[in-house]
Amino acid sequence: MPGLTPPDRFCSATFRTFEPRSASQADALDAARRFVEAYRRVPSLTERVGRWLGWGPSRPEGLYLLGPAGTGKTHLLAAMYHALTPEVPCAFLHSSTLFRQTKPPDAFARQLAESYAVCCLDEVEIDDPANEMRLVQWMKTLSDEGVALLGTSNVDPERSLVTHVSGGRVHRFLQTAFRDRYRIVIVEGDDFRRTDAVERTGHVWVAPPARTRPLLERARAEGVEVFAD
């Protein structure tokens, strides 16, 4: 399945380029690094035998970055993707890609498992019980197939929609199995997008290209960061 990579604005996101502005962001950065280190670590013979017998440490199943918008969650998700690839095949997709699928969620998960060892799911926001149940089925199938999941969301899985409409397996998964399988890391802080916008000052030119081009070239020559649309 081609094209399952981070968006262009995060194509060069790394742990080094992430600048924590709060204690929880620093903790999230550390958790992301530790996940990559643990996943890439080559187990000893004893550990491999232990995994085969069902005891001893196993590879981490996933990491779930939870917090408000603009706190760097997607940057960290993309940084983990880049730190793992190409040695570890990873898929990166927005939650809307999952919900637009016409095939059953378990079939889509198995299709991903054929090519990828880690799946990065960005911006999990659920406003529909049907989509939430699709998400749970997809996640359970990925786990059963041995695919690790890295996710970002503004929504605590324990405060989900189906909590109020279902008392069955979906509810139990979100309340218990989710925390057993995935480490949840809180990422708090000011909205990067708003603080960066305040810190960046400059000029805006609105005119035909022939008139704005000389102004843009002059600004570039003066070392000003230029965005042209």
Residue ranges and their predicted role:
Residues M1-W55:
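A short, basic N-terminal segment
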Residues L65:
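Hydrophobic anchor at the beta1->P-loop junction of P-loop NTPases
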Residues G70:
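Walker A (P-loop) phosphate-binding loop of P-loop NTPases
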Residues K73:
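Conserved lysine of the Walker
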Residues L76, M80:
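Hydrophobic positions on the alpha1 helix immediately C-terminal to the Walker A/P-loop
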Residues T85-Y116, P129-M133:
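Short glycine-rich substrate-engagement loop in P-loop NTPases that contacts/grips substrate
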Residues E225-D229:
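Conserved helicase/translocase motor-coupling segment
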